[in-house]
């Protein structure tokens, strides 16, 4: 067995021992030893391998897999620009704290600077965006030292896993594992009895690291009029569920929220203090409240850092030790304002003469059922879902909120669906299987349309429906400063970016079923039986979005 093959097999074995169950592989020559080792592990049923030709979409596929499975996922690629194409996914994984492992095959380091083909300084390429950048070093052709080399390779792999999962830091995130490989890059004809150097007995990792306990209790008196703002990455806090909670769709508060609070109700209330969970990013009324110097803010997070955009946080910890109880009059007032806000949004939707992205979001929200997984685009869709009063009871909601880019949304949804469909708690049944429903805008869909490319031999979601709210451009800019009517002569082109893409034709090019439907037929289409991946396009208007949102605000 040649050194590169031996090293690759050891690394793959140790990754599996450390909890890796899904790996995304992009084809190349230099990463061939890893590719052969991964294929062997897939054939043996130890991992599930996903082959993709585009490293950018592969990275987001891995993010979807990792988020939905709650486990580290690897992406393996060859050297050069293949590594650079992981940049967007690495940045998202950094800020969303996703355990993404970049297995970057490299040329031998002595070739750097020589002009060798497909060679660049890729170790450390991701800079501060990764938790660690670890090099394994070239495998030596030294059979007499194989036991020592085996220990070195396995120990390094464990360090990669610990950094990615945050076992010692409570701060999961991406890691680059750079592995220079020398020819030969394919397995030798092996003599009978050739074996890979073994790991610890019983399938245990080479170096066991228990999960760190990160606990910083914070005493908070709930007798003051309090609201909870739960953003992306919020932990579950059972002792706070009796408070009014403004929960972003990805916050895990569906079944634990007897007092939901609509974000548009906040300006109608005057809370005396705020408990902030996770990292809220969606709503301007929330940002305004968190920035109010007269309102104390207590930040509770699941890791060592806490968000504080306005610099207004009074204290930070990981859990609340509560004293006092909320006043019934305050809870009643919040409940009334919540219902008023939801009713206002829905009544204005009914009165509006055109179909907008908000209408599409409302139709999707009303069609969901317990056991579903919902993946939301990072621009208007995730905000629209919060505004139409989505109930997340029994629903898993995902969205790329790390840096909130629209790139990779299709691939993220596919990865999330693949992970969800084989999760232990998957609620599917033969008569009514649980689904993954993705709601994304047309720009996000077109931007990541290559994510639809799944080879005929690759794992494919069996219950994924992608709803494309197509308003032919960037609808979110209609609601920002750039959407000011006085700028309309130029803003449509440079911000709205109309594209006129035929979504159905794009789907057909990738052999994906897709069709255009009316918004009032969306529930029926989502409930249609069948397996596989489908795209449902709903035409929407963005020219009246500013008017619709203004009408909602005025009615409130």
Swiss-Prot record:
It catalyses: isochorismate + 2-oxoglutarate + H(+) = 5-enolpyruvoyl-6-hydroxy-2-succinyl-cyclohex-3-ene-1-carboxylate + CO2. One of its GO terms (molecular function) is manganese ion binding. The keyword Membrane does not apply. It is an enzyme of class 2 (transferase). CDD domains: TPP_PYR_MenD, TPP_SHCHC_synthase. Signal peptide: none annotated. Keywords: Magnesium, Manganese, Menaquinone biosynthesis, Metal-binding, Thiamine pyrophosphate, Transferase. Its cofactor is Mg(2+); Mn(2+); thiamine diphosphate. Coiled coil: none annotated. Pathway: Quinol/quinone metabolism; 1,4-dihydroxy-2-naphthoate biosynthesis; 1,4-dihydroxy-2-naphthoate from chorismate: step 2/7; Quinol/quinone metabolism; menaquinone biosynthesis. The keyword Manganese applies. Its EC number is 2.2.1.9. Catalyzes the thiamine diphosphate-dependent decarboxylation of 2-oxoglutarate and the subsequent addition of the resulting succinic semialdehyde-thiamine pyrophosphate anion to isochorismate to yield 2-succinyl-5-enolpyruvyl-6-hydroxy-3-cyclohexene-1-carboxylate (SEPHCHC). PANTHER family: 2-SUCCINYL-5-ENOLPYRUVYL-6-HYDROXY-3-CYCLOHEXENE-1-CARBOXYLATE SYNTHASE, PROTEIN PHYLLO, CHLOROPLASTIC. Homodimer. Belongs to the TPP enzyme family. MenD subfamily. This is 2-succinyl-5-enolpyruvyl-6-hydroxy-3-cyclohexene-1-carboxylate synthase. It comes from Mycobacterium leprae (strain TN). The gene is menD.
């Amino acid at each position: 067995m040649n050194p590169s093959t031996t090293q690759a097999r050891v690394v793959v074995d140790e990754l599996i021992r450390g909890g890796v169950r899904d790996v995304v592989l992009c084809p190349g020559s230099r990463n061939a030893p890893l590719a052969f080792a991964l294929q062997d592990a897939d054939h043996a049923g130890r991992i599930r391998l996903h082959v993709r030709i585009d490293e950018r979409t592969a990275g987001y596929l891995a993010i979807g897999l990792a988020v939905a499975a709650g486990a580290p996922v690897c992406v393996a690629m060859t050297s050069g620009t293949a590594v650079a194409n992981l940049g967007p996914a690495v940045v998202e994984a950094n800020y969303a704290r996703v355990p993404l492992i970049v297995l970057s095959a490299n040329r031998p380091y002595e070739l750097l600077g020589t002009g060798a083909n497909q060679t660049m300084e890729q170790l450390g390429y991701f800079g501060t965006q990764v938790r660690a950048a670890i090099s394994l070093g070239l495998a030596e052709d030294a059979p007499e030292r194989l036991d020592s080399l085996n220990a070195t390779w396995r120990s390094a792999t464990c360090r990669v896993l610990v950094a990615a999962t945050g076992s010692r830091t409570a701060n999961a995130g991406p890691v680059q594992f750079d592995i220079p490989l020398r020819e030969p890059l394919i397995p030798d004809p092996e003599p009978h009895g050739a074996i890979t150097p073994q790991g610890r007995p019983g399938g245990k990792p080479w170096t066991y690291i228990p999960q760190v306990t990160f606990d910083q209790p914070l005493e908070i008196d709930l007798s003051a009029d309090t609201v909870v703002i739960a953003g992306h990455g919020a932990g579950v806090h059972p002792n706070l569920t009796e408070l009014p909670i403004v929960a972003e769709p990805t916050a895990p508060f569906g079944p634990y929220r007897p007092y939901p609070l609509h974000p548009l109700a906040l300006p109608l209330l005057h809370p005396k203090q705020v408990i902030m969970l996770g990292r809220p990013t969606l709503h301007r009324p929330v940002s305004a409240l968190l920035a109010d110097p007269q309102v104390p803010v207590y930040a509770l997070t699941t890791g060592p850092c806490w968000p504080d955009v306005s610099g207004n946080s009074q204290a930070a910890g990981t859990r609340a030790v509560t004293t006092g109880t909320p006043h019934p009059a305050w809870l009643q007032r919040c409940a009334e304002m919540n219902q008023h806000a939801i009713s206002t949004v829905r009544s204005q939707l009914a009165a509006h003469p055109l179909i907008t992205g908000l209408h599409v979001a409302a139709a999707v929200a009303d069609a969901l059922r317990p056991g579903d997984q919902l993946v939301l685009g990072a621009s208007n869709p995730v905000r629209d879902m919060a505004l139409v009063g989505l109930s997340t009871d029994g629903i898993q909601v995902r969205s790329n909120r790390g840096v909130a880019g629209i790139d990779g949304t299709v691939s993220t949804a596919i990865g999330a669906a693949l992970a969800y469909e084989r999760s232990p708690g998957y609620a599917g049944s033969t008569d009514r299987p649980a689904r993954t429903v993705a709601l994304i805008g047309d720009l996000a869909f077109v931007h990541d349309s290559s994510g639809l490319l799944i080879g005929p031999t690759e794992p494919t979601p069996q219950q994924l429906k992608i709803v494309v709210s197509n308003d032919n451009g960037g609808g979110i800019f209609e609601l920002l400063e750039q959407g000011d009517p006085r700028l309309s002569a130029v803003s449509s082109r440079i911000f709205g970016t109309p594209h006129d893409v035929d979504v159905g034709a794009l789907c057909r090019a990738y052999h994906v079923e897709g069709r255009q439907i009316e918004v009032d037929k969306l529930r029926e289409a989502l409930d249609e039986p069948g397996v596989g991946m489908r795209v449902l396009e709903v035409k929407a208007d963005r020219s009246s979005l500013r008017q619709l949102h203004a009408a909602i605000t005025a009615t409130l």
